[in-house]
Amino acid sequence: MNTATQTVSDLFDAELRAAGQLPVEVHCHGFGPVDFSDLDALDLDGLEAACVAEGVCAIPTLYLHRDCLDAFEAMVGTYAARRADGELRHIVGIALEGPLLASHGGTPAATVWLPTRGEWERLAACGRNGLVYTVMSPDAFAAGSGLEGEIDPGAPRFEDFVPLLVSSGVRPALGHFSRKDPSRSAAFVERIIDLAWQSGWTGPGLPVVTDHLFNDMPLAIRHAFRTRRARAERDETVASYRLEEWTMDRADEILGPVPAAIMRNAAAGRIAACINFDGEHVDSDIAKRAIELMGTENTMIMTDRCDSARLGRQRLHHEADNTLWYQQDGVVAAGSQPLSRQVTNAREHGFRDDEIWQLIAGTAHRVFALSGAGTPGRP
């Protein structure tokens, strides 16, 4: 947690802050000692106080064990009631990472599961109490998905639950892809986005967002250089990509079908894409070029942040070469850099302050239809 007296907003001129917006942590897993996914220990008052101290709003992002659905419903009910009473003004929504994931990546495996129709209805009902998005894999039902063995002919499909979620204010957040068939996965990206827009969404905001671009998806490039050995090759590798020559019409060829589909739809204003700017989830120059192509107005910086060495009932650890959190098997589980540090990184890579403000505040307020300190909008 940031213990400095200077808040994230204080890093910017008053003119940029004049609209009354605050920066938004749009995807984060833990502030201070609390793991948001530990529903027994989740301290909403502590999170609110941390947000005030850092000068941010937050959308805490939880992993959900199937046996905790009752507790999750109770938590969002309490959250909504307190918001209605004017409390928790800096906690501007709740999010889930999963449970419908084709590749669990750094997500605890026990929090990846295939909801029944009734469970989707229960999750959708949480929309009225502040659930603003759930990360899901567009290729979750395809060959190569980690859920493949659990899918039976009667399992609800996207056509059954995406309209239900979206009409309840719960956005699909696209991520955690299989690597088996990138072209097919990209086609499913388009399908989910079409379904969301055809599901009666009338705004405010947008009906689809993403998990972090370039992570947990099939790629045609090396997107990150996390070890000392990898960084020794970094400059030569990134130079070979000729970033300045990247164009959206060549994104499939350069980056691969899945990131290209996401970036194309973001640039068209149909979705908003999240990207991490800690320089470790994604190389900062690659992230910068992707943002330039999509537009800052269509992009949100996310931290994927966890402040403690525990997340979703699993122990985490740091490696010597970076600030990321790792699972025991060496898979990246989360980031640890707060938004203030990512602001500094964005400045060092040539973004103007008005562009950075758009990335950490403006786009999120538009996409989630926030007002004042933040009130999530509903369709």
Regions found by a protein language model. Give the residues of each.
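N-terminal hydrophobic targeting/anchoring segments and the immediately downstream early-domain regions
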Residues: 18-22, 49-56, 78-81
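Divalent metal-dependent hydrolysis catalytic cores, especially in the metallo-beta-lactamase
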Residues: 25-38, 45-72, 88-103, 127-146, ...
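Metal-dependent catalytic neighborhoods of phosphoester/phosphodiester hydrolases
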Residues: 69-79, 105-108
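His/Asp/Glu-rich metal-coordinating catalytic cores
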Residues: 89, 106-113
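Glycine-rich beta-alpha junction loops
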Residues: 98-100, 213-219, 277-281, 303-309
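Extended, charged catalytic domains and RNA/DNA-binding interfaces, predominantly
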Residues: 115-252
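His/Asp/Glu-enriched, well-ordered alpha-helical/loop segment
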Residues: 221, 226-275, 289-378
